Each structure stands twice: as C-alpha cells, then as structure tokens.
C-alpha cells in the first residue's frame, strides 16, 4: 500500500498558500488492512479513515460510476487494484487532480500544474457533467482564486451550461447550495461566484430572484450603472470592503429583489420596491435554508434601506419608529450590521464608491441618544403599563429632536408617510 497527499493541499502548496487540511489517498489497501494498522474508519458511503496519530483523513483510492440523478447518484469501487490515476480521474478540476508522495514527488497526469501556472480552472474529463454540484464548486473556486487571476476555461463553462440545460441542478439540496454559497461569501471576491453562475446560466435555477434583476434599468441620476443586477453585484463588492461578515454581504446582495418584479411600464422607477421585495427575500432565504441572522438582516436591508439613505431627512418620530422596527434597542449589534449593508448599497453605484455615507453615523448617534432614556428611572418615578411605554416614546422623540437640531439642522424633513413608516 502507498499513500499520496491529494487535492487542495497539493494545489495550495504549489500556489504558495497556507495548507489548512491535508487529505490522503491510499492505493493498494483494503479496509481490513487499514483497521489492522490502527486507522479509525469514519466514512459511511465509502471507506475514509483517520490516521491513528495525526487524525488526518485517508481515503482508499476509488472510482465513481453514475447511477442516478444528482450529486449522490454514484456507485463507488474502492478495490485494491484501483490506481492513483484512476482516483485522480474522477476529480472535478485539473488543479485538484494532483498528488504528491511522501518524498515530495508530484504526480500530475492531467497537467494540473500547467493549468495552475496559467491560472485556468479546467475540468479533468467529460465525466465532469455527472455531478451538478460541480457548477457551484467551480464558481466558488473562481471567487476564491479571482485575486490570483484565475478564470474558468471556456470548454469547462460550456459543460457547466450543459449541466444547467440537463435540469440536473434541480437535484441539488438546499443544504449543499447554501454550503457552497456561504463559503463563497467568505472569499475576497464573492461577486465572481454569482457572476460565474450567471455565465453558466445557473443563476436562474439557483437564485432566480437575483437573476431577474439583470436587464432591469434604474434611474440613471441615482444609478449611473443603470442595470439592477450589476448594482447588486457592486453592492456586494462594497460590502466586502466594509465587513468580513457573510451576513452583511448577503444582505447587500439581495436588498433590491423587489425591483425584479416592477412592471416594465414603470421602469426605470421602482415605487414601493422595498415592501414588494420582502416576500421575495423570505422565499429565497427559506428555500436555501439560510440561518436566522442571514434571513433577518436581509429582510431588514430590503425593507428599510431607503429609510436609512434618507435618515437625515426623517422626522424624529419616524427615526424612533425606524429603530423600533429594527429592534435596535435590544439588538444593537444587528442594527450595526444593517447600517453596513445600507452603506454598501449606497456605495455600490458607479462613481459613488468613495463617497461618504453620513447617514450611518447619524443613525448610530440616534440610537445612542435613545439608549440614554432609562426605563428603570421612569419606573422609579411611578410610570407603569401603557403610560410607561408612552413616556419612553415621548422622551426618545424629544431627545432625537434635539440631536437632529445639533447634527442635521439643514436637512429638509420628510414625514414617515413618505417612506412607509406610518
């Protein structure tokens, strides 16, 4: 039996990047031999073992044969006569189909190193099309290595389009879609993930609400980039500069879903798109089973981003209602994430990338002002029940009025009815 370091560890080592996880392939062994040497079996579908000391994963070399739809419809053969090249052949990309023996010798039957140096993401074999998950994986790799100049090979993109045309993407579970997506959101350039999905015609299947934004115009005065889909990707790009939080990036990306269903005769205006978008955001986040904070923040950004942009103009009572709607008193940390998503939206426009966004600091000040009203003090003064709530509200509004006079004295006030907070 012979073991080889494979996959991402070899790829990243050759790129000069830190190697986080090391996976091994074992050739010429049986499960019984692995157990006899002290390895612990952990794989259910095919034999994967943990090294008795390092606890690194060691998988028996295997081949996979398509037996049904989706990414789970495979029959595995892990007999001892499976060669290393047989195992590498089943992998998705050439840069992931390299191996290294214990002496550091590279095994590269599919020219992965050449593609690595050329910065190309290329499929190993036509069997690439047998696994629909690879569409998302390639998009994620494209986003992960975009800053190094990697692009998807045209012939690989064609196979991704073929997978989409086959309808196989519908076999992907929500969990796998979200797993790939949230990993992409954590990369330096997640915009590339969604762009590659669009180029592969897969965005319409995976995120149809987002795909619907492309080709929808906005008012050039406020959106020189015009296209709503492009604006959404630009907002995501700006969110990456403002925060490493995947929740902020996701919220910035899908805040304008309501514009995708605006009747064409109303273009380029999108009246009430914030409220219209709420159901679309709910549908998307529930379909992909996004975690609770992702869903909450995306809904807030969708429903209230216009209020945030116009914060300096809003009346004191409307500002207090906005903070109440965002549950800012009890969840100030989430409100801060909301402000970052709104700032990303404002800056995600051609020519606006470097412009200041005073609304965020203004609303931070409004929240801090309201937090100085202590309910305990009012209780001590005898306020209870409904009277207590009314007095807290009255004092918050009065305090915000004074704050506005000091910090936004020249802003033209607009009532809550103008932004849907009546």
Curated annotation (Swiss-Prot):
Disordered as annotated region, ranges: 403-422
PROSITE patterns: HD (PS51831)
Catalytic activity: a tRNA precursor + 2 CTP + ATP = a tRNA with a 3' CCA end + 3 diphosphate; a tRNA with a 3' CCA end + 2 CTP + ATP = a tRNA with a 3' CCACCA end + 3 diphosphate
Family matches, as HAMAP family: CCA_bact_type1, CCA_bact_type2
Pfam family, one: PolyA_pol_RNAbd
Binding-site positions, Mg(2+): 21, 23
Name this polypeptide is given: Multifunctional CCA protein
Residue sites binding CTP per the record: 8, 11, 91, 137, 140
A Gene Ontology biological process term: RNA repair
Binding site for ATP: 8, 11, 91, 137, 140
Note: A single active site specifically recognizes both ATP and CTP and is responsible for their addition.
The record's note on its domains: Comprises two domains: an N-terminal domain containing the nucleotidyltransferase activity and a C-terminal HD domain associated with both phosphodiesterase and phosphatase activities.
Organism field: Hahella chejuensis (strain KCTC 2396)
Record-linked InterPro entries: CCA_bact, HD/PDEase_dom, HD_domain, NT_sf, PolA_pol_head_dom, PolyA_RNA-bd, tRNA_CCA-adding_enzyme
Residues in coiled coil: none
Cofactor(s) needed: Mg(2+); Ni(2+)
Oligomer and partners: Monomer. Can also form homodimers and oligomers.
Cofactor note: Magnesium is required for nucleotidyltransferase activity. Nickel for phosphatase activity.
Protein function: Catalyzes the addition and repair of the essential 3'-terminal CCA sequence in tRNAs without using a nucleic acid template. Adds these three nucleotides in the order of C, C, and A to the tRNA nucleotide-73, using CTP and ATP as substrates and producing inorganic pyrophosphate. tRNA 3'-terminal CCA addition is required both for tRNA processing and repair. Also involved in tRNA surveillance by mediating tandem CCA addition to generate a CCACCA at the 3' terminus of unstable tRNAs. While stable tRNAs receive only 3'-terminal CCA, unstable tRNAs are marked with CCACCA and rapidly degraded.
Keywords: ATP-binding, Hydrolase, Magnesium, Metal-binding, Multifunctional enzyme, Nickel, Nucleotide-binding, Nucleotidyltransferase, RNA repair, RNA-binding, Transferase, tRNA processing
